[in-house]
Every structure is written in C-alpha cells, then in structure tokens.
C-alpha cells in the first residue's frame, strides 16, 4: 500500500515499532499527501511479521478507533491463512474478501469465508477483481453470477481489468483518483457502498479494439 499511495519514501517507523514501544502510534502513521484524513500505518519493513500478535493487533485497532478517532480502520490482509491473516482479522468487525474469476481463487475465497465465520465474522462480502467481460462472454472466465452462487455471500463490488492500474502504481498515484479510469470508478463505488450507499453495479465494458484505442489516447 505504501507504494500504491506513493508514501514508500516517507516511512520511518512501522507497526512493529509501535507494538514494541519504539515510537508512539501517531509517529508511525503517515498522512497522505492528498487527503488530510487519510493515514497509512506501514507493515513491518524488514523484521519478522510474526512479531505482532493477534492480541496486540486487536489493541492497536482499538487505539486507532478510540484514541486517534478514525472513522474507518482498513486492515489489508496478506494472501493465505498464515499469521498475517490471523492478525488482520483479530480486531475486525467486518470482512471483505477480494478474489479473482479463477477456479483456484474462488476455492480459496470459499475457504476463507469458512474461517471468518468460525472466528465470529458473519456476513462477509466479496469484491471480484480483474474481471473481463469479453472473456466471460467467450466462456474463458467465470461469470459474476456463477461466483456469487458458489460463494453465497453478498457482492460489494466488481473491478474490471485495467492496464491503468500498473501505470498508477508505478507513479504512486492511486487509480481511484482517476476520473476517467473504469477501475477508479469501481473503487470509488466500493468505498461508497462501504459507507452505506446503495449503488448499482457498474456495467462491464468489452475490451475491443475501440476501447483499447480510447484508453491509449486517454479518451476513457
């Protein structure tokens, strides 16, 4: 996330420094250059990520909500079900699973749903990432309806495959700030749904020659 947000060069302390009392919580938090109310608390940069326990993570999330008065605390979980996953869900009261339209990814997501429910996180939601309408139409990619039928949880957003994400990541400029990018629109819609708005799902655009040309010249 530090790279995506363009904050990687401003990291001095990280989450391990906080739990080991090497710095105060507010010292480790990096304020975004564009939004005053947006902060990043970096993960461990060099040390073992198991240095943080689920108990410490739960306390940390509580401090962010109460002492720092954060409206939302979003914990980005690493892939898999190892210690990083256990830490991520320790202080969570809501879970959003991000998956892709691949059979193996959907199986993993289904397994994660079971683990979340076993930990008391009921009613998780799902984001379907990197979906392409043309491949779905050809039968080369799982469709949204098929995935939701398998997972049996609510859909909170779909994100189309977008080459602009690579460009925005390399520039350290979140694509959500790009008004012309479909993926940016998708992310903004997801954020609004998280905040309680009822929005229809965006219609997927088939990636044909015309749409690729528009993206190339900056018309879409």
Q: Would you name each region that the model predicts?
A:
Residues 1-68, 169-176:
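P-loop/Walker-type NTP enzyme "switch/lid" segment
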Residues 3, 17, 37-40, 94, ...:
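Residue-level recognition of specific faces of alpha-helices
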Residues 8, 46, 78, 101-102, ...:
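Short beta->alpha junction loops/turns
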Residues 23-24, 164, 199:
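Generic structural signal for secondary-structure transition and capping sites
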Residues 34, 118, 152-153, 161, ...:
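Generic secondary-structure signature for well-ordered alpha-helical cores
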Residues 55-59, 63-67, 77-170:
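Conserved catalytic-core segment of NTP-binding enzymes
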Residues 73-74:
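Walker B beta-strand of ABC/ABC-like P-loop ATPase nucleotide-binding domains
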Residues 171-220:
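NTP-binding/hydrolysis catalytic cores, primarily Walker-type P-loop NTPases
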């Amino acid at each position: 996330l530090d790279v995506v947000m363009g904050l990687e060069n401003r990291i001095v302390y990280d989450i391990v420094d906080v739990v080991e009392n090497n710095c105060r919580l507010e010292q480790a938090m990096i304020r975004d250059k564009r939004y005053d109310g947006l902060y990043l608390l970096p993960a461990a940069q060099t040390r073992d990520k198991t240095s943080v326990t689920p108990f410490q993570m739960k306390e940390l999330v509580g401090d962010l909500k109460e002492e720092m008065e954060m409206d939302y605390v979003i914990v980005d979980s690493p892939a898999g079900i190892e210690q990083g996953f256990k830490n991520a869900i320790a202080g969570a009261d809501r879970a959003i699973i991000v998956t892709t339209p691949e059979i193996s990814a959907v199986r993993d997501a289904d397994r994660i749903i079971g683990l979340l429910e076993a930990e008391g996180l009921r009613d998780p939601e799902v984001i379907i990432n990197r979906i392409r309408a043309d491949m779905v139409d050809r039968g080369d990619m799982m469709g949204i309806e098929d995935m939701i039928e398998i997972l049996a949880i609510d859909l909170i957003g779909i994100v189309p495959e977008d080459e602009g994400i690579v460009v925005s990541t390399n520039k350290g400029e979140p694509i959500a700030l790009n008004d012309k990018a479909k993926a940016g629109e998708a992310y903004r819609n997801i954020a609004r749904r998280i905040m309680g708005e009822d929005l229809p799902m965006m219609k997927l655009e088939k990636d044909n020659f015309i749409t690729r040309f528009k993206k190339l010249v900056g018309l879409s």
